[in-house]
Amino acid sequence: MARIGESVDLLKCSFCGKSQKQVRKLIAGPRVYICDECIELCNEIIEEELTEVTEADQTELPRPKQVYDHLQEYVIGQEPAKRSLAVAVYNHYKRIRAGVSGHTLSLAGAEGDEEAIEVAKSNILLVGPTGSGKTYLAQSLAKKLDVPFAVADATSLTEAGYVGEDVENILLKLIQAADFDLKKAEQGIIYIDEIDKISRKSENPSITRDVSGEGVQQALLKILEGTVASVPPQGGRKHPQQEFLHIDTTNVLFIVAGAFAGLEEIVQQRTGKKGIGFGAPIRDTADVDIAGQVQPEDLLKFGLIPEFIGRLPVVATLSKLSVADMVRILTEPRNALVKQYRKLFQLDGVELTFDPQALEAIAELALERGTGARGLRAILEDILMPVMFDLPGREDVAAVLVTEDAVAKLADPEIFTHEMIEAERRRHKSA
């Protein structure tokens, strides 16, 4: 019986459960005990977290020129938009860096006193036609900064309680992109496309509920500004025990984008460049360039609510791409489509080339379809599909040439065998 009594009175660590006989030291607190091993483990965890913060602080933050140069490698044209994005992103992460490293953002007063101020974040609105490079710009930014990146579509969002996706689902995508590392997610980038589709249906507030327009704008306000949001993991296997994941959006950069069809007319009416009445000249508004002319009142008239506009202080406009721009997109960027398909053909030991006229025809076709740069891959796939189907089964093919007729579907891409090339080489030698 004595042994039983002794075991009952034996003190144990409240954290690991080891008894005082199994550890070197047991420190007592108010109704709790902690052993030396648990203290050592706690110190290791704290040191590891401090090291991570220090390393993050010491990592060089890309300057606007470096961000711009990176975008130049991947995105053709849109110079003003690239400059605006580079500056906005640099200021955003400089603001975060100052907060993480414990720097005080202060403003010196007239009498030498310092008043601490809070620097608000600058979310970004991209305005540009379909296929002008809005999504690709955001993706390239995230790649340069090495931060989690999530893409969402505003058209699928509705107010909480209605059929559709809640705005919290956007945050869940970012958390998933960060592999459920909430600290990384809280410094990530969220890109929301088709933001113009959630404009309210009329300029005047309606008595009927607009659950996919103004209602979504209202729901987005808090996460755009910065709040601690509760996100349901929806069966996330890495956190099955948690009902909600809590993420602070204060340092999440939001880039929202849309085509804003019809905004050109609003800008023209404001600037007095659009005639009114039956005698006014008819002009295709799709050809009007509004770069650098968009003002908050234009967005308000389009259907965005004032509070939503106020949370998007940086507005960058993208121009419609020309045929020359499209040809450059096909050939110049690091991951240009022509380079990608040449690499695919090289893997089969075949050289792929394009006539200059063929490249122009592809660019014109993409513009005619109204799909912009994102339609280029579909056109190339359609042109090269017959060749790519037959190529793996043929060992005699040395080269493939895409001509203007091949783009127009008047002929297939020209195929040159090793024998044909050798015969041509001998003919040139004899000549």
UniProtKB/Swiss-Prot annotation:
* GO MF annotations in UniProt: ATP binding; ATP hydrolysis activity; ATP-dependent protein folding chaperone; protein dimerization activity; unfolded protein binding; zinc ion binding
In terms of superkingdom, the source organism counts as Bacteria
- Does this entry carry the keyword Transmembrane helix? no
Instruction: Show the PROSITE patterns listed in the entry.
Output: CLPX_ZB (PS51902)
List the CDD domains.
RecA-like_ClpX
The answer, when asked if Metal-binding is one of the entry's keywords, is: yes
Which family would the database say this protein is a member of? Belongs to the ClpX chaperone family.
Enumerate the NCBIfam families for this protein. clpX, PRK05342.1
Write the protein's name: ATP-dependent Clp protease ATP-binding subunit ClpX
Species name: Kocuria rhizophila (strain ATCC 9341 / DSM 348 / NBRC 103217 / DC2201)
Taxonomy of the source species: Bacteria, Bacillati, Actinomycetota, Actinomycetes, Micrococcales
Q: Which gene encodes it?
A: clpX
